[in-house]
Amino acid sequence: MRGRICFLAIVILCSFSFILVRSLNEEGRVLLEFKAFLNDSNGYLASWNQLDSNPCNWTGIACTHLRTVTSVDLNGMNLSGTLSPLICKLHGLRKLNVSTNFISGPIPQDLSLCRSLEVLDLCTNRFHGVIPIQLTMIITLKKLYLCENYLFGSIPRQIGNLSSLQELVIYSNNLTGVIPPSMAKLRQLRIIRAGRNGFSGVIPSEISGCESLKVLGLAENLLEGSLPKQLEKLQNLTDLILWQNRLSGEIPPSVGNISRLEVLALHENYFTGSIPREIGKLTKMKRLYLYTNQLTGEIPREIGNLIDAAEIDFSENQLTGFIPKEFGHILNLKLLHLFENILLGPIPRELGELTLLEKLDLSINRLNGTIPQELQFLPYLVDLQLFDNQLEGKIPPLIGFYSNFSVLDMSANSLSGPIPAHFCRFQTLILLSLGSNKLSGNIPRDLKTCKSLTKLMLGDNQLTGSLPIELFNLQNLTALELHQNWLSGNISADLGKLKNLERLRLANNNFTGEIPPEIGNLTKIVGFNISSNQLTGHIPKELGSCVTIQRLDLSGNKFSGYIAQELGQLVYLEILRLSDNRLTGEIPHSFGDLTRLMELQLGGNLLSENIPVELGKLTSLQISLNISHNNLSGTIPDSLGNLQMLEILYLNDNKLSGEIPASIGNLMSLLICNISNNNLVGTVPDTAVFQRMDSSNFAGNHGLCNSQRSHCQPLVPHSDSKLNWLINGSQRQKILTITCIVIGSVFLITFLGLCWTIKRREPAFVALEDQTKPDVMDSYYFPKKGFTYQGLVDATRNFSEDVVLGRGACGTVYKAEMSGGEVIAVKKLNSRGEGASSDNSFRAEISTLGKIRHRNIVKLYGFCYHQNSNLLLYEYMSKGSLGEQLQRGEKNCLLDWNARYRIALGAAEGLCYLHHDCRPQIVHRDIKSNNILLDERFQAHVGDFGLAKLIDLSYSKSMSAVAGSYGYIAPEYAYTMKVTEKCDIYSFGVVLLELITGKPPVQPLEQGGDLVNWVRRSIRNMIPTIEMFDARLDTNDKRTVHEMSLVLKIALFCTSNSPASRPTMREVVAMITEARGSSSLSSSSITSETPLEEANSSKEI
């Protein structure tokens, strides 16, 4: 028995000893504590096992032979959470790298306890706050990387204490203040990369004390003053990168003494004077960028000494004189850009010696002479742009035979002769632009092999012959411009093969025959102009299939017959010109559906019947409504008074009768209103609009008189000749139209054009009665709470205007006081007659709102579909929308900063719920202040999901609808046409700017056109932050100003031009919460704490 006990004791002792041996050492436990503050969503740190004896084999850990941890490298592991200073318990730690993760929070001050640290890399995370002064106590530090975070404040002036520092990389933050002169103490510093911040002041001359400096990168800041001459002391400097600042003065000749310089990037500043000849002493120069300054004078011939240069860009200056032939000595040159200067003389044939040249752009100058034959032998030339000069003669015949072109643009010159045949020999040509020259002959059939071509622009020449059938094999063509030539023949049915075509211009030629019905295959076409030809026949109804078209011009031909009703399906049309043809019949009533139309030209035809009252629905008409010189009869519809933006109205030379509607006299935008030569009676309405117009606009109506005269007498016509219209009237009215557009329409055209050019095709209508599809009618068809359709009619007084709460793109919202005393909001969606978007909105909104519940989301009580009425029943918000509240005057605005802060946080939480907690994820698509509704306590509720997009909803018909409202639309949508949650975040950032500034999202054109640009411009112009804040707010409270400044930063994060740089909504909620929780005031001004422009990723900072 005793022996057994002894044996058992030995076993237990051995087991205990084994455990002691296998237990994790102190450094391993420190790392596990450090890991506890991180979220390892991808499991990269799964090898960090507490059962190991030491951490030396763990992922990202490096040790000495004595198993002491010296390096923690967690780069790119998708980690989030916060950075714990517990890591400094690793006393042998020399390197800490957590870059390219999602770690947030401030940089811990206690990192200063890492006394042996040599490398600290926190780049590309979500760190915010200031750079802790305590970091300057780590005197062993050699490399400090803090780039691509959200740090603000200034560089600690104690930075000079880091005597061992070799590399300081802090670009892409929101740092401000001056470059501290104490950096002169950093004798071992080799690299400074501090671009894309908000540093101001001058470049300190003391920086010349950094005698080891090789790279000085301060691009994209707000630095001012001249370039310090003391920089010549930096004899080790290879890269001087100062682009996009506010530097001015002349480039000092002393820059030529920095003998090792390889990169000199001074572009996008305000440098004046000439390019110093001493720049030719920089014989090691590789890249020289001086573009977008105000440089004058001639390019020095000494430029030819830069024999190792690969890229030289002097574009967008005011340089004069000849292009130096010495450029031909730089045999390594790959890029030469001299465009947009005032350069004269011929193109030097010596450029033909640059056999490595890839890109040559000499456009927008005053160059003359011929194109040197030598250029056609450059084997690596891919981009040649010579447009907008005074070049003449023939294009070299072998151009393209030896060169692998992708872009070739020689437009806007005086080139003559035939088009050479070898442009696309290597099948890489993407753009060929030879327009606005004097080229003659036929379009070369050799282009039939150019499958790569996307843009072919040969307009405004003297080309003859017919359209080569081979052109229609170029399936990648998106733009075909052959206007204003002498081309003839029929339009081939093969035109329909170009299914990627977006722009087709065939105007001002001699084409005959009919437009082939295959034109309907061009379903991506945006602009189609075939005006001023000899085309006959009917306008093909198949044009109604070109649903993306925005500009259609068929004027000045010989088209006859009725106008196809199908043209009313082109709901994206902005400009429709059918004038000067032989069209008969009535104006299609379906034209009332073209609600985006800005210009409608139907004059000079044989149209008859009445003017459709539906034209009054074209409330976007602005440029012109011209239905003159036809055979129209009946009265002028009173509905034309709805065209509140219209500037030019031509109704003259018809057979119209009755009186002039008083509503037209109230169109304050009207510049021209010609209703002469009709059968109108009565008096001209005595309004300011008509008072400023000449009486000739009303002449030729024998029963019409001017009310301003004491004795009302008929107005005498100036001319009633239809022939006068056909000969010169059309041109005269066009001239008047253009003049008025220039004077009165620049801003509004830009405003509407920017908004509508980014809109996409609406889907075909799908009947709501179809209940076979899930998530559409099954769950929510019957309204909740016992509401009936008749009850809703009674509660809204038959949808009276008196109870209208608001109007939107999808419908009108009414206040409904139900018989039981409950108040709700009823949204009546637009009828099908206004397009399918209403029913798509109905379906998407139900599918979305019916499934979610959140305190900051507007509740959907139910919906009702009755005959053709689609009704949504919402929770009533007594305080209306945020937009309405912000638009009130100073005395009526009920929103102090505390209320605005709570609204910002509540709306952020609602949007965060949609993005992160709904399955599938919901993207709102139309976040704006008018869609953030307020209850009686001013609590925010996100509403109006008429444009909502469920990422995975198979049956949602709103997926290709336009995303957002003008002023709120993310910039990337214009070219990607894709909607992501980042678009919502951009829009929400605009809402935050509205809350802070009190300004609407759309600003005058001279101020940038939208609120984001206005704020960015104010910051760049050093406007004090407090002057950007809403004047109705109390800015005497420091805490309030501090919170507003922080929310302004958040807004600028959200409205970053790069979607990848925008935070998630969870991060936005966290930042807004932290803004109020912050206890200390920032000492720096926000005026320059935010990067406002994204740099090209290929450029160094």
From Swiss-Prot:
Occurrences of domain Protein kinase (ranges): 799-1081
Residues on Extracellular side: 24-734
Pfam families from the UniProt entry: LRR_1, LRR_8, LRRNT_2, Pkinase
Record keywords: ATP-binding, Cell membrane, Glycoprotein, Kinase, Leucine-rich repeat, Membrane, Nucleotide-binding, Phosphoprotein, Receptor, Repeat, Serine/threonine-protein kinase, Signal, Transferase, Transmembrane, Transmembrane helix
UniProt xrefs under SMART domains: LRR_TYP, S_TKc
Catalytic residue positions: 926
Transmembrane segments: 735-755
Domain of life: Eukaryota
Organism: Arabidopsis thaliana (Mouse-ear cress)
Protein name according to UniProt: Leucine-rich repeat receptor-like serine/threonine-protein kinase At1g17230
List of residues binding ATP: 805-813, 827
PROSITE patterns linked to this entry: PROTEIN_KINASE_DOM, PROTEIN_KINASE_ST
Region Disordered: start-end pairs: 1076-1101
Phosphotyrosine: residues carrying this PTM: 874, 913, 968, 975
Localization: Cell membrane
Top-tier EC class: transferase
An MF annotation (GO) of this entry: protein serine/threonine kinase activity
Cytoplasmic topological intervals: 756-1101
Signal sequence region: 1-23
